[in-house]
UniProtKB/Swiss-Prot annotation:
Belongs to the GCKR-like family. MurNAc-6-P etherase subfamily. Residues 55-218 form the SIS domain. Specifically catalyzes the cleavage of the D-lactyl ether substituent of MurNAc 6-phosphate, producing GlcNAc 6-phosphate and D-lactate. Together with AnmK, is also required for the utilization of anhydro-N-acetylmuramic acid (anhMurNAc) either imported from the medium or derived from its own cell wall murein, and thus plays a role in cell wall recycling. InterPro entries: Etherase_MurQ (IPR005488), Glucokinase_regulatory_CS (IPR005486), MURQ/GCKR (IPR040190), SIS_dom (IPR001347), SIS_dom_sf (IPR046348). It is an enzyme of class 4 (lyase). A lyase-type mechanism (elimination/hydration) is suggested for the cleavage of the lactyl ether bond of MurNAc 6-phosphate, with the formation of an alpha,beta-unsaturated aldehyde intermediate with (E)-stereochemistry, followed by the syn addition of water to give product. This is N-acetylmuramic acid 6-phosphate etherase. GO terms for biological process: 1,6-anhydro-N-acetyl-beta-muramic acid catabolic process; amino sugar catabolic process; N-acetylmuramic acid catabolic process; peptidoglycan turnover. HAMAP family: MurQ. It catalyses: N-acetyl-D-muramate 6-phosphate + H2O = N-acetyl-D-glucosamine 6-phosphate + (R)-lactate. It comes from Salmonella schwarzengrund (strain CVM19633).
Amino acid sequence: MNLGTLVSETRNPQTMDLDALPTPELVKRFNEQDTLVAEAVKATLPDVARAVDAAAAALKSGGRIIYMGAGTSGRLGVLDASECPPTFGVPHGLVVGLIAGGPGALLKAVEGAEDSQQAGEDDLVALNLQEQDLVVGLAASGRTPYVIGGLRYARQSGCTTVAVSCNPDSPIAREANIAISPVVGPEALTGSTRLKSGTAQKMVLNMISTGAMVKFGKVYQNLMVDMKATNVKLVDRACRMVVEATGIGREEAETLLKQTDFEVKPAILMALTGLDAAAAREKLAAHQGFLRAALEH
């Protein structure tokens, strides 16, 4: 593949004079380019929705969401995966981020790590990949060998696969069941795909993980009711969520949360139904953790 023909590698005619611009104009040019990202992502929403449903199906069948990428793309996957346990109360390892070159590549580039298809396969083998897992390959260029190797192995293993790229009709798209390709155009700094391409990938990952967790029962209304209250700020947020979801006073909310070890869902159910903590947990379990279903039945 001639990399120079990739949209993400071409020069942007709107930013040819970056090195001659005064600072206010310099940052204005970057901002003008960033405004294009949301529209590019909007054009991919039908495919993002398919990925959300596939991610939720993986979780409901006992599988995992596995992101894999190199460089910025890999770091974004690790970032999204690492936020899921504190945000949604899921165990570490339910959403996994793999980066070419291993964890050390998060802080320092590992030269050449992305160039091996076998490394992508090996990293999935090391995770004991199962067919109920969803594998999401991330590559702004759409041609990273590490990601191609991983997606190919995942598909051969019976997994549903998703490719996220910022170039149309990319090699990784051809390896995936679902292709998400927000074409954001040439970067303000030629080839620096940590810019618009990275922003677009982050937006897509936000929707995949959050949407999947909504459909996995981790959200009530728009509240992260399975959040782990692990510090003072989050204990306060837990209390506010109970108040906002039920209309009770803060003091009563705090009393209920103490009875549930600061778990928000059973506290809300207790406030709205009069159940005690044990009965509230039992009812939630009977409805697979979906608070709305527990309240309505």
